A protein has these predicted regions:
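N-terminal catalytic or cofactor-binding beta/alpha core of small enzyme domains
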Residues: 1-138, 150-151, 157-164, 168-189, ...
């Protein structure tokens, strides 16, 4: 039997794949640091519902429980093995299919992870990642918060604690943006999010086929609507820059380069 039907407002759902060592690590610290209470097969704390699941969240096509948004606690793997704390929105740009993004969640998590890195003197890179992988069919915003990048790091206690604290950080507000350009690990977009109030949800990197339709879909799949397009001009060729300009004009949305955002201290 599953948990009882939530009462009142829908919860923010924290999903933790039981076979994911990073998810287990983060869960352990959430339950140690905060007064979550058993709630059916889950744990509840106010508006948060922590749910261990058997199915890999990447493959979800429907919500396991009613929720206002989903945060997936996850591992991140890369051949570099570089210690990493990362955040991203899921989507499959190559197919033109994107999940619903909530930039406020992405920005809040990224800033909280950076603060945890500094306070704990952690060696981890904190970064926004480009939009990639599923799930893409859920009816609410989805955000991944991850520990990388190898088996040793997934179980690192300090990393699990840092993510647990970030998840419980009060939501911050900013200007909702779609990011374009740059590499998969987006140092310039990350810098902009840490130094300004431009909150990027979907990030479409330079290596995807950057069409006006794809940018428009990213704008459409931003909860509350995107207020601007934040462009890494150094990470775009002339054709891509032209596409961004034409699309922002057609949609009636401001376009800023990262240099402009940093200079204006938005």
């Amino acid at each position: 039997m599953g948990p009882p039907e939530p009462v009142g407002s829908l919860p923010r759902l924290l999903l933790a794949h039981r076979e994911d060592p990073a998810a287990r690590n983060i869960c352990r610290h959430l339950l140690r640091l905060y007064p979550f209470r058993p709630w059916g097969g889950a744990y509840r704390l106010g508006e948060l519902l922590l749910l261990p699941v058997e199915e890999n969240p990447l493959n979800l096509t429907s919500l396991p429980l009613p929720a206002s948004e989903v945060l997936v606690l996850s591992r991140h793997a890369s051949t570099s093995g570089l210690p990493t704390l990362s955040v991203h929105v899921p989507g499959k740009p190559e197919e033109g299919r994107l999940a619903l993004a909530k930039p406020e969640t992405v920005g809040t998590l990224l800033r909280a992870l950076q603060l945890a890195k500094e306070e704990g003197d952690l060696p981890h890179r904190v970064c926004l990642e480009a939009t990639h992988h599923g799930p893409v069919d859920l009816p609410v915003p989805v955000t991944f918060v991850e520990i990388g990048s190898d088996e040793g790091e997934w179980s690192r206690e300090e990393a699990g604690e840092a993510v647990a604290k970030a998840v419980l950080s009060p939501m911050e507000r900013g200007r909702r943006a779609v990011g374009v350009g740059g590499p998969h690990y987006a140092p310039r977009h990350t810098e902009a999010m840490l130094r300004t109030r431009c909150w990027v949800g979907h990030l479409l990197p330079k290596y995807v086929k950057l069409t006006g339709e794809l940018i428009e879909e990213a704008v459409r799949k931003t909860q509350g609507g995107a207020e601007l397009i934040l462009s890494d001009e150094e990470g775009l060729n002339s054709s891509q820059r032209r596409t961004v300009e034409e699309t922002s004009s057609r949609l009636g949305i401001s376009k800023l380069t990262i240099k402009q955002a940093l200079a204006q201290k938005l």
